[in-house]
Amino acid sequence: MRKLLLATSFFVLALSTDIFSANKPQAGTKEQPAAIIQTTMGDLNCVLFPKAAPLGTKNFIELAKGTKDWKDPRTGQTKHGVPLYDNTTFHRIIPDFMIQGGDPSGTGAGEIGIKFKNETLSNLGFDHPGRLAYANAGPDTNGSQFFITEAAYPSLNGNYTIFGQCDDASVALVKKIAREPRGRNDKPNTPIIIKHIKIDEGTH
């Protein structure tokens, strides 16, 4: 079973500009929800992009809330009404690049029985730190695993679905997490746990 790995090439593509950036935490609304990723090292605050990535955003919200069924890769059992991300880990951390999590197996190779197509836009690229995107094992193999970048990384453009943007304080936390001691396959020596992902869709 192939692990969901990201290309680490430093080949630089032309930068694109877009309006999707966040300097500070933003409250969620029905039109643009926000995700608060609560970890054992602090909270990551990210706005989501339902217009740019409707499939990816919907999938993330439903898995976070537990309103979408998924298969536990450790047991093969179908989970119903269970938030997928609770008590999972960031299983891969790379300084100057990103942190990756969202696999219930904690290995990067877990299959949850969900795959959906890539959603990429020419004006939405990895030209900002703090991009929230799906990891994949090739085109149209998105599931639950996601990564957050700590720097602009335009060589990823067009290959991964960006569905959110984390604020500056969250990028600082990503950098801190990415520099934790790590071992084989860039796995942290001490587990960095995602305790819960809260979805803020406003009050209206």
Where are these regions (language model features)?
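Cyclophilin-like peptidyl-prolyl cis-trans isomerases
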Residues: 14-204
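Sec-dependent N-terminal signal peptides
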Residues: 4-13
